[in-house]
Amino acid sequence: MTDMRRLGQRAKQASLLIAPLSTQIKNRFLSTLAKALVDDTQTLLAANQKDLANAKEHGISDIMMDRLRLTSERIKAIAQGVQQVADLADPIGQVIKGYTNLDGLKILQKRVPLGVIAMIFESRPNVSVDAFSLAFKTNNAIILRGGKDALHSNKALVKLIRQSLEKSGITPDAVQLVEDPSHAVAEELMQATDYVDVLIPRGGAKLIQTVKEKAKVPVIETGVGNVHIYVDAQADLDIATKIVINAKTKRPSVCNAAEGLVIHEAVAARFIPMLEKAINQVQPVEWRADDKALPLFEQAVPAKAEDFETEFLDYIMSVKVVSSLEEAISWINQYTSHHSEAIITRDIKAAETFQDLVDAAAVYVNASTRFTDGFVFGLGAEIGISTQKMHARGPMGLEALTSTKFYINGDGHIRE
């Protein structure tokens, strides 16, 4: 028996042991964990420093280092996310509907756990805690497989969670970490149909594509963030400037950062110089512009076809000038990763049309795409942002980690 199968068996058994846990027990434990994270900050930072040192040795960019880095403030924010999950209403056992049918059977449809969730993710160590807290609150066991660049951080975080579970009299196998970073073991997890009820990949395009191709277990696809901002003919250009700067430069390495800028030709000649001047005072950006946009910049390079479909995760942005709202919507729907999209406009009808017709999990009017986040949406720490339409879409909070079951009660009923 392989290590992966042993781990899967333990997770399956743990899912049965934690299935009956009450809301009170779960919330009390999550509050305990939130405190333990803060109390153990120095240990967690020391482990993270090992990952940062390894990343530096391998020439990882500053932007990607930021995804990997833990700080005291970030650990405090992770702990706050755990506490927020504790404070949320428990969906498990929630009655979705109840009725008596024509045969006199009493039928209830309730929310129940999924069972065992597997999570494959990349650099960010906070995902370990975020994913566990949501899985635990919904009575699911979870198997975590992080990237090798965050292995020391993930080991320290999962060790803390397991120790906290054990101290609380709860099976520590409710969370398990796959420490082997090999692709072979990852593929074994993707195909563990005997143990894994659902797999959630969270990372870049290559990871998502690999999971889609290799997985035999059900997958909830979380998306790459090829995110666009459309500046409409009726846009307030001051607001547009502020939003583009925020969405592109605040944290370019995250999936809700903007990667593409689409501008109506009626405002392009005014807006582009205005934006370029303002953004250069904050953080210069490399503009990859189409033929109409290129001469309007002081500094830009001609866009290649692949630039319009790339999640840069860097201070780089593609630029497209369009002649109508319809062309903007068509362009965005061609290149979107179905994550988050935004329109800047004072035209209410244009805003409504954009929100109705753009195919994305979150569609904004006059706001930065950086708000697409489970914590911001009031869902607690998110397990990922789903870009598919089946089961869950957008930031996935507690309900996304549940299924439903029908409970039918009779009194000797038989079907004639």
UniProtKB/Swiss-Prot annotation:
Pathway: Amino-acid biosynthesis; L-proline biosynthesis; L-glutamate 5-semialdehyde from L-glutamate: step 2/2. InterPro entries: Ald_DH/histidinol_DH, Ald_DH_C, Ald_DH_N, Aldehyde_DH_dom, G-glutamylP_reductase_CS, Glu-5-SA_DH, GPR_dom. Keywords: Amino-acid biosynthesis, Cytoplasm, NADP, Oxidoreductase, Proline biosynthesis. GO terms for cellular component: cytoplasm. Its EC number is 1.2.1.41. GO terms for molecular function: glutamate-5-semialdehyde dehydrogenase activity; NADP binding. It is found in: Cytoplasm. Gene3D superfamilies: Aldehyde Dehydrogenase, Chain A, domain 1, Aldehyde Dehydrogenase, Chain A, domain 2. It catalyses: L-glutamate 5-semialdehyde + phosphate + NADP(+) = L-glutamyl 5-phosphate + NADPH + H(+). One of its GO terms (biological process) is L-proline biosynthetic process. NCBIfam families: PRK00197.1, proA. Catalyzes the NADPH-dependent reduction of L-glutamate 5-phosphate into L-glutamate 5-semialdehyde and phosphate. The product spontaneously undergoes cyclization to form 1-pyrroline-5-carboxylate. Belongs to the gamma-glutamyl phosphate reductase family. HAMAP family: ProA. This is Gamma-glutamyl phosphate reductase. The lineage of its organism: Bacteria, Bacillati, Bacillota, Bacilli, Lactobacillales.
